[in-house]
Swiss-Prot record:
Protein name (Swiss-Prot/TrEMBL): Glutamate--tRNA ligase 1
InterPro entries for the chain: aa-tRNA-synth_I_cd-bd, aa-tRNA-synth_I_codon-bd_sub2, aa-tRNA-synth_I_CS, aa_tRNA-synth_I_cd-bd_sf, Glu-tRNA-ligase_bac/mito, Glu/Gln-tRNA-synth, Glu/Gln-tRNA-synth_Ib_cat-dom, GluQ/Sye
Motif 'HIGH' region: positions: 8-18
Residues binding ATP, per UniProt: 242
Annotated GO MF terms: ATP binding; glutamate-tRNA ligase activity; tRNA binding
Coiled coil stretches, renumbered: none
Biological source species: Rhizorhabdus wittichii (strain DSM 6014 / CCUG 31198 / JCM 15750 / NBRC 105917 / EY 4224 / RW1)
Motif 'KMSKS' region, residue numbers: 239-243
């Protein structure tokens, strides 16, 4: 069974980049009848908060990305300790006593020689007596994972294709701090093994991490999952944007963006498939394949999202929005108004046009025409086709046509020059209210 996981750190809110990661993990699991897991990587106990965790859950709920199970790394420290001891017994983790200042000095020396900042494994050469002396000074060791320099790192990425890393060109990663707390690398692997994760979907900034973690999977005697490393998002101008890092679900809600619009865009940008409006995210499962994703950065354009949002609103059924519409608006009202909306909450303004008071600046030369219109509106059959009947009668009586025929009527009846199709809107306004508005505009 396919098992994916979304593993945010609850040190902040979700932004558009990790919303995209969550979506693709969810889509891959759902498209293959698998499981989608939420894992809160909260090993940073100082910066992780329950408020942020709650906001992550709420954002996933708003998007409809409901996980099949949830776990918190802070509840799993005993498991990490157990697996760490296995690695320690194998000699695959080792204690290091350098201070941050000493490590920085080593990096500067290497940089001055034009060499990459690879850890020199000096800690492996320490004698028991030297370790004892360091600890007598009060130094507590941090721990590194010992990479196997004789095992080249290779995998076939679902997006990037064949990948190769030389472990001799990588530093042994620190997996545990001197205070005993955990860094990201090892707990992530331990959890992926324990949770049966089959596919790890994340950003391309994790490619080197994957190379390191593949050796951890092997050291722990576990099969490696498949990996898909996605190109990063850039703004509409084609550059990394600070704004993208601040765009989250709250911002999208404030813009009136429908969850399905955000999903429809993020599901397709960066792929060979066109971005299309859908009313149900399930329609996007067919054809969702990491082989369709390119390696070029994916452009996220807020204007494109807003345009897509409007197209989706124009196809949403009444049942999907009924709870967000103004009191009294029925299916006929929604279907009449929705072609003119860019966001659902604009419906209230158009419903006020139907039921509330309207006013407009009427040209003096149109007042007599509107008086005729009031009489004609009172005389026609309102059962069906009221707008067509009204304009036909007025055209025949006055000789007006085009804008001169229609615009004064729309202004008098709605107070606006543009809006929904009057064939659909006029029956909602109703005969009595329409006659009253026409007479008021004529006076």
């Amino acid at each position: 069974m396919v098992v994916t996981r979304f593993a945010p750190s609850p040190t902040g809110r979700l932004h558009v980049g990790n919303i995209r990661t969550a979506l693709h993990n969810w889509m891959w699991a759902r498209a293959h009848g698998g499981r989608f897991l939420l894992r809160l990587d909260d090993t940073d106990l100082e910066r992780s908060t329950e408020e942020n965790a709650a906001s992550i859950r709420a954002d996933l709920g708003w998007l409809g990305l409901h996980p099949d199970a949830e776990a918190k790394q802070s509840d799993r420290f005993a498991l990490y300790e157990s697996r760490f001891e296995e690695l320690r017994a194998q000699g695959r983790v080792y204690p290091c006593y350098e201070s941050a200042e000493e490590l920085e000095l080593k990096r500067k020396i290497l940089a001055g020689r034009g060499l990459p900042p690879i850890y020199d494994r000096a800690a492996l050469a320490l004698s028991d007596a030297e370790r004892t002396a360091y600890e007598a000074e009060g130094r507590r060791p941090h721990w590194r994972f010992l990479l196997d320099h004789e095992s080249p790192i290779a995998w076939t990425d679902l997006i990037r294709g064949p990948q190769h890393l030389d472990p001799r060109l990588l530093s042994d990663p620190v997996v545990r701090r001197a205070d005993g707390s955990w860094l990201y690398m090892l707990p992530s692997v331990i959890d992926d093994i324990a949770m049966g994760v089959t596919h790890v979907v994340r950003g391309e900034d994790h490619v080197t991490n994957t190379g390191l973690q593949l050796q951890m999977f092997a050291a722990l005697g576990a099969p490696e999952p498949a990996f898909a490393h996605e190109a990063l998002l850039v703004g509409s101008e084609g550059k990394l944007s600070k704004r993208l890092g601040s765009l989250g679900c709250d911002a999208f809600r404030d813009e009136g963006i429908e969850p399905v619009a955000l999903i429809a865009l993020l599901a397709r940008i960066g792929t060979s498939l066109p971005v299309e409006p859908v009313a149900d995210p399930a329609a996007l499962f067919d054809g969702f394949d990491f082989a369709r994703f390119g390696r070029a950065p994916a452009r996220f354009d807020l204007d494109e999202l807003k345009a897509l949002n409007a197209r989706i609103i124009h196809m949403l059924p009444y049942a999907a929005v009924a709870g967000r519409l103004p009191a009294g608006m029925d299916a006929a009202g929604w279907e009449a108004i929705r072609p003119n909306l860019t966001r659902v909450d604009e419906a209230a303004g158009w419903w006020a046009v139907v039921e509330g008071a309207v006013s407009a600046a009427i040209a003096p030369e149109d007042r007599a025409y509107l008086a005729q219109a009031a009489d004609a509106a009172a005389a026609i059959d309102w059962n069906e086709g009221a707008w067509k009947a009204l304009t036909a009668a007025l055209g025949a009586a006055t000789g007006r046509k085009g804008k001169a025929l229609f615009l004064p009527l729309r202004l008098a009846l709605t107070g606006r020059e543009h809006g929904p199709d009057m064939n659909a809107l006029l029956p909602l306004i109703g005969k009595a209210r329409a006659v009253e508005r026409l007479r008021a505009a004529a006076s």
